[in-house]
């Protein structure tokens, strides 16, 4: 634990990425200095013609969406007949210490979207963003809208903030002095160590994610049991310092992304109000990182979009990763979008089981006709290596 810099939450020796987590079959079909693009092997006789791209948070590894076959959202999407791709962020090293928010939007998300369209031959794709991956996706879509380009046919946003006026517990730690210190620290580049992120998120829930394990591991001498989700939680990543400093100031501190024209990204003024596409917004009721009020606020930020908002039980991760087959927990729907989440909940209907069923029903008619599947990649973009690729296996030192 001293060497790792954090208290062990699970028996990490039980897991290996690509062996028993992140095991969905597929291939890396494109890579650059920021990400690898993975396309998954079809599991159905026919697939929808419009491809589907998943964008996870760059502050974690992508395999939270592909833990094991029985709780993999990736596998669920593939089983629904979607030609599924995912963006696997590289764990930043010294070569990436200068990378900015603009780099992640342009060379990351926008490039990934373009490559998916080139590989599939489609004109538009369906795209999903999770946590800060959703915030970055909304930014990328706004950049494209300013350029009068629309690559996305629909967008799904899972537990993400666009309006940071209600950022939850994290907002208590961020003020002008803290942000200015980080900006000075990373003015010439540098990396935010993975351990800093891991410990920050752990101490947001100290009784559950710190002291519980201190007592069991150190006082009782017990060995933590294997748990795939906690293994992923411990497999944190570094972040480029300039990216991190920009994110702190323009979201948590000044909430500038939601102010039309207040922020310039990739040479374009950001205006979420110019986005015009069907969107599915999901928030978790007990989320301590993206409060349900903050998740719901996106319904009013995306004022020109055809929107559906759904609330699930549980928290930031467990609420999202709630496989349909296990029939656990519940979710709420309401076709109306009143001004507050309190009003929305009052008019909502509770459903037993996973919200995945509702989302699948929403996405299917947006995915086009079905046709015979193809192997991952094409003649130009051939398989580089099997999924999950080597980027996700790079551990933070």
Which positions does each model-derived feature cover?
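Short, surface-exposed "cap/lid" segments of acyl-processing enzymes
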Residues: 4-94
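Gly/Ala-rich beta-loop-alpha elbow adjacent to hydrolase catalytic centers
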Residues: 129-137
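Conserved alpha/beta-hydrolase "acid-adjacent" motif
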Residues: 288-294
